């Protein structure tokens, strides 16, 4: 994968429910990223890439992903970017890109799911300075 593994907000682990990362330690495939080493984001922002490798398992289920930031690792997160809310049969599999700026230290992807018997596989959420080629 052409992305930096240290900038991986979710690593492809199957999602079976809402995931709210609050730690630098990976749990359920998700993690909080410490942006201090990056000295915040560049002037033109940073890209967040959502890759959904397969469709949702059940009709009526949804997945919504937001990018949040905070000055504190475990709490105080505020939404700074979002991806479209996806449902079975709409836009999956697919790749979505959004951009954001932050001067705060911590960034996470909040994954909110609704429905019953929820399962989403091959989901990656990645950060990148330039997630696409500029010609």
Map each language-model feature to its residues:
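Exposed aromatic-hydrophobic patches
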Residues: 33-35, 92-101
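Noncatalytic modules at the cell exterior or secretory-pathway interfaces
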Residues: 46-50, 100-120
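Solvent-exposed, flexible loop/coil segments flanking beta-strands in beta-rich domains
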Residues: 1-41
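Solvent-exposed serine/threonine-rich low-complexity stretches and specific carbohydrate-binding patches
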Residues: 79-89
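Extended, low-complexity, turn-rich repeat/linker tracts enriched in Gly/Pro/Ser/Thr and Asp/Glu
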Residues: 53-62, 115-119
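Short, surface-exposed beta-strand/strand-loop-strand elements in extracellular ectodomains
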Residues: 59-74
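Short amphipathic, basic-aromatic surface patches that mediate peripheral association
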Residues: 37-38, 48-57
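C-terminal interaction-tip segments
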Residues: 1-17, 114-135
């Amino acid at each position: 994968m052409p992305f930096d593994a240290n900038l991986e907000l979710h690593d492809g682990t199957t999602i079976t429910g809402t995931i709210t990362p609050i730690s630098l330690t990976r749990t359920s495939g998700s993690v909080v990223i410490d942006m201090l080493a990056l000295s915040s984001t560049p002037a033109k922002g940073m890209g967040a890439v959502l890759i959904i490798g397969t469709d949702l398992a059940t009709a009526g289920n949804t997945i919504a992903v937001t990018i949040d930031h905070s000055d504190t690792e475990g709490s105080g997160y505020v939404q700074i970017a979002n991806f479209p809310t996806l449902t079975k049969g709409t836009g999956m599999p697919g790749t979505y890109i959004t951009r954001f700026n932050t001067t705060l230290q911590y960034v996470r992807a909040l994954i909110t799911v609704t429905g019953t018997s929820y399962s989403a596989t091959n989901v990656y959420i990645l950060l990148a300075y330039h997630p696409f080629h500029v010609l």
